[in-house]
Amino acid sequence: DIEGNTITTDKATYDKIKDIIITFNNSKLTFENNYELKSNKIFYNNIKKIISSDQNSILTDIDGNIVTVNMFQYYLEKHLFSSIGKIKIVDIDKNKYFFKELHVDTKKREMIGSDVTVLLDQENFGVSKENDPRFVANDIFVSKNKTNLSKGVFTVCQKKEGRCPPWTLQAKKIIHDSIKKTIYYEHATLKVYDMPIFYFPRFLHPDPTVKRQSGFLSPFFTNSSSLG
């Protein structure tokens, strides 16, 4: 189309009255900022300027981050990719994100999601295989240089079915500034076995890249036998 969006597919039909193209099997959509989307079925509504699918689809950005969804709608005029349901992202650092709702601004390259679980890669985070570093949060907003989590909970404790982590760090807001390589917490509470121990109006520490590059140890707890 005139926006530079292209679709390739094995098979397609065109409804002239509704001005809708439907593709089948091995369909690939390429659009602005080198986003690429693959699906077995794509609907292109030229009147409403919406591209959509009710099938499992995979969205990949120019950096190699991979988004897997079970449905999507892409609003051409708003440059907005939206999905509800089972959503998974694997980023280039092998971190895994799970959402129930996701919206991606393909022009600004920003993302917002809800009901978020983030499983951080153990090796990149600098912890042993006995630890499971992770975040859960109500919402997440990701821009070029910052990641914002609202009502977030962080722990590195190993997952144990039916048991709460030995410790968690909970905060009203968690901000990761990739330029300053710092993680900020607002209204943070350290809990041990779900009991509040310390409260910090504000708290910050270097992100794991500082530890890897300089050997500087970030102030976080690891899983230990003393905490179960």
Predicted regions and their residues:
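Structural signature for solvent-exposed beta-strand/loop edge elements and short helix-capping sites
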Residues: 1-228
